[in-house]
Amino acid sequence: MQQTKKLTHSDITIAVMSGPFLQRGEPALVSKWYRTKMALACGVDLVVELPYAFSTQKAETFANGAISILNALHVSEICFGSEDGQIENFYNTVSAQKNEEETFNRLVKQFMNAGNSYAKATSEAFLHILSSEKNIDMSQPNNILGFQYIKAILMQNSSMQAQTIKRFASHYHDETFNDQHIASATCIRKQLFSENSSFTEIESFIPKATASLLASYKQNYGTLHNWEQYFSFFKYKLMTMSPEDLRHIYEIEEGLEHRILSKIQTSSSFHLFMEALKTKRYTWTRLQRACTHILTNTTKEEIHCANIEQHAPYIRLLGMSQKGQTYLSKNKKKIELPILTHTKTFDHPTLHIERKANSVYFSIMKEPLRTQLLKRDATHHPIRYDETTAKFL
C-alpha cells in the first residue's frame, strides 16, 4: 500500500476486493466486512466488491471484472504486484501475443492436446513466441494476472495507466517464512491453520490492524474459514449428485464429473480429495474453483445469465474513508453503474449468485448466528472510517 501511494502519488486509493470466495478457489479467511476494515485501517479510501461471478474465475475474467469496476469509478491509475516488476514488459507481452495470436492459439491447443493444463499450455506457448528479455515470465501467477489487467485496460479502451511493484523475498506459493518481515498469503494461511497455531507467529508479517481484526473475528465467531470446514457439506452434496447433475455445474467439463464422484468416495478430507483429484491437465487452483462452484451450486446457466463477458453490472460499496466519501460525492453523477450501499432491494442475476455464495460462506456458523450474519450481509451499509482519528464511525 505504501509503495503504491509512493509510486502513483494518488489522491485517493480504491481497492476492488473479492467477496466470500477467492480467485484461487477457496473461502476467504474472514468475512468481507472484516477485510474491509483491514483495508480502511491500512490506508484504502474506497473498498468495493468484485462479484462472485468474476472473483472465482480464471485470471482473464477476474481482471476484466475488476478493471470494468475501476473504469466506472473513473480511476486514472492501477497498481499491482508482480514477479517481473517492469510495467513495459507487460505491455510488450500483450502486444506480442496480439501480433502472434494465430500462432499462439495453435500452440496452446497443441500443448493441451499433449495433456497439459491450460495454464501450463499457455505458459509454454508464450515461451515459444516471446523474447525473454522484453517480456514477462508467464509461468508466474502474479505476472499472469498483471498481463490480464493490461489486456483488459486495452480491450476496454480505458485511459487508465498501469504501474507494477516487484514482489521480493517471498513467492506466491511459498509455504515457509523465508524473510523476517515478508511472507506469502499461502504461508500465512498455512500457519494460521497449523496445529497449536497462534497469531504471534504472523504478527511481524502483517499490519497491526490486520492482526487485531483477525484475532477479533476468531474470538467473536469461533473460527477462521478454510476448505476443511466445508468438506462435510461438500461431500454430502456430491454424494447426492449424479454425473448429469454435476455436468450442469460451472467449470465441470470433459468427463471431470466422473473423476470427482469417484475420488470423493474414498476421501476423508478436502486436502486428500484434492490430492487424489489433481492431474497434469487440471491445476490445483482450477480444480478448487470447480469445487467452489459445486459447493455454491453455481450452474453454467447462472454464469451465462450473469453475462461475465461484459462489465460488472453494479458497484457494491463495502467501505469508505472521509476522503473516499468526498470523492464519491463529487463524482457520483459521472459514474454510470449503480452504486449499491446494500443489496436488500436490488435484483440482478449476478447478485442471485452472490447471495448463494454468502449463504454458503456462513453455513459453518452455528445458529442463530448463521441467520443473523446472512441477514446482516444483505442490509449492511458501507463501513465508514475517519482516517484523521483512525476510528470507525
From Swiss-Prot:
Give the chief site where it resides: cytoplasm
What keywords would UniProt list here?
Answer: ATP-binding, Cytoplasm, Ligase, Nucleotide-binding, RNA-binding, tRNA processing, tRNA-binding
Q: What is its EC number?
A: 6.3.4.-
Which residues are ATP-binding? 81, 142, 167
| Catalyzed reaction equations | cytidine(34) in elongator tRNA(Met) + acetate + ATP = N(4)-acetylcytidine(34) in elongator tRNA(Met) + AMP + diphosphate
- SUPFAM superfamilies reported for this sequence: Nucleotidylyl transferase (SSF52374)
Compartments, record wording: Cytoplasm
InterPro entries cross-referenced by the UniProt entry: Rossmann-like_a/b/a_fold (IPR014729), tRNA(Met)_cyd_acetate_ligase (IPR008513)
The cross-references to Pfam families, in alphabetical order and at most eight, read: HIGH_NTase1
Q: Which terms in the Gene Ontology molecular function aspect does this entry carry? A: ATP binding; ligase activity, forming carbon-nitrogen bonds; tRNA binding
Which Gene Ontology terms of cellular component type are present?
Answer: cytoplasm
Query: A biological process (GO) annotation for this entry?
Result: tRNA modification
Give the record's family classification: Belongs to the TmcAL family.
Fetch the HAMAP family from UniProt. TmcAL (MF_01539)
* Role, per record: Catalyzes the formation of N(4)-acetylcytidine (ac(4)C) at the wobble position of elongator tRNA(Met), using acetate and ATP as substrates. First activates an acetate ion to form acetyladenylate (Ac-AMP) and then transfers the acetyl group to tRNA to form ac(4)C34.
- Specify the protein name: tRNA(Met) cytidine acetate ligase
Q: What species is given as this protein's source?
A: Bacillus cereus (strain 03BB102)
